[in-house]
Amino acid sequence: MTSKFKFFTDRKHFFLGVIVGLSIVLALGIGQVFANPYNYKVVKVSDGDTVQFEAPFMQQYLGLKPVLALRVLGVDTPEKGGRAQCPQEDAKAQAASAFTKDAVAKAKVIQFEIKDHDKFGGRVLGDVIIDGQRLSELLIKNGYARAYFGEKKQSWCN
């Protein structure tokens, strides 16, 4: 007997179809889930431009851990630790992290504006709105970040 759905009889194509289908469903559903801006509790400031927050919908809708990391879109902050190119960059990264931690700690209202997902996976891209001010703008204004939109990054080792 010949199947109408011959494409799905091959195991590889079947799983590909399932993945594509789930991707479409998630893409359509995430627009509903990520209505902007959202108020969630900050769990951790990873570095100057990455903040982790409680995201209960991750577990409720997707069955994933309820914490999501947001990288601030449109900025480049220095790298810290082993990713720093020089001691000066690491020091600047520590200062950027301290600035973000302090801003979050003093905030009365923190909102997350989610725009996209990170190409490296596991994070979303957007902005953190702290008492009505965008973290991206605060980081740049106070010298802890540079505007960045995909061009070649400038060195922090000057």
Role assignments for model-derived ranges:
Residues T2-N158:
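Small beta-barrel nucleic-acid-binding modules, primarily SNase/OB-fold domains
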